[in-house]
Amino acid sequence: MNASELLHRHLDQCPLVAIIRGVTPDEAEAIGDAIYESGIRIIEVPLNSPDPLKSIERLAAKFGERMLVGGGTVLDAEQVRAVKESGGRLIVSPNTNVEVIEETVDAGLVASPGYFTPSDAFDALEAGATALKLFPAEAASPAVLKAQRAVLPKDVPILIVGGVKPDSLRPWIDAGANGFGLGGGLYQPGQSPAETLEKARAYVAGLKA
């Protein structure tokens, strides 16, 4: 299964990515259980979390093929390699860094770099990006996405990240979004698994609104 097939397999089950910034390794598995129970099948552990590679390792070992687990805020090629060694299969960046994308592609992992302009997007795609992350979405709009969708390849998934709320998903979907990255609205450091499950279910319900 190549990177694109891997991503689509999990996005097709639920087009949401749980970004659990600030989670600790001791919390990761219980938080992962809550996210899995909600129906979400993709987890991103930002690398500016406490001991993130250990959290990725534990989540990847626990869920195996049932979830797509990886690292976020990946800023250089060395971090790509570290995530892979920890069992992660997804690399998410806040920016369009060709070196990071190419290293991710060479490693056979899913590459989801951040972009904001069409120039960013085409640079990322030329480097081999699997998907594109519109970030920060708070500074864009569904109208902006719709205009970008008119020129970007139709088969490239675009994920919306930044300020996404359960009641704001539908306009983005109608504009051409394929999924969403859920950050602070889903998880805050120290949050309980029960609260995480409640918030995750609200986002899953928002997809059907």
Regions found by a protein language model. Name each.
Residues 76-86, 119-127, 164-180:
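Catalytic cores of alpha/beta
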Residues 47-48, 74, 96-98, 116-117, ...:
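Short, ordered loop/turn segments at secondary-structure junctions
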Residues 16-20, 43-45, 69-72, 91-92, ...:
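Hydrophobic faces of well-ordered beta-strands that scaffold small-molecule active sites
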Residues 90, 94-140:
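Histidine/lysine/aspartate-rich catalytic loop segments that bind and position anionic ligands
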